[in-house]
């Protein structure tokens, strides 16, 4: 069963030094823990690699905000990565098996 979580780029379109990907939904830590090389902790900025099938996409800062103390009232994960659109879109793409993309 797919999650009802959504995922979207939270920074302006185009290249920049940093980009933010925001994911909101239920049970995100258990759904997405396979993407990160380190364990996430509530409200802690963790420097970790984002990986898929042992391919590392980027080293990122990842912050987990557990429900209900988040922007949306659900679990929220913020991935602060390099702002290259290819990197950001790759990170979102590996999440598609569990998440639906935010429609812009």
Tell where the protein language model's regions lie, with residue ranges.
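A glycine-rich (often HGG/GG-containing) alpha/beta subdomain
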Residues: 1-100
């Amino acid at each position: 069963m797919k999650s009802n979580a959504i995922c979207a780029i939270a920074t302006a379109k185009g290249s920049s030094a940093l980009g933010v990907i925001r994911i909101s939904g239920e049970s995100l830590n258990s759904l997405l823990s396979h993407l990160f090389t380190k364990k996430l902790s509530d409200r802690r900025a963790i420097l970790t690699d984002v990986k898929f099938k042992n391919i590392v996409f980027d080293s990122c800062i990842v912050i987990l905000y557990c429900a209900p103390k988040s922007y949306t009232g659900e679990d929220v994960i913020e991935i602060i990565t390099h702002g290259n659109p290819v990197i950001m879109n790759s990170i979102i793409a590996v999440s598609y098996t569990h998440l639906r993309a935010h429609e812009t």
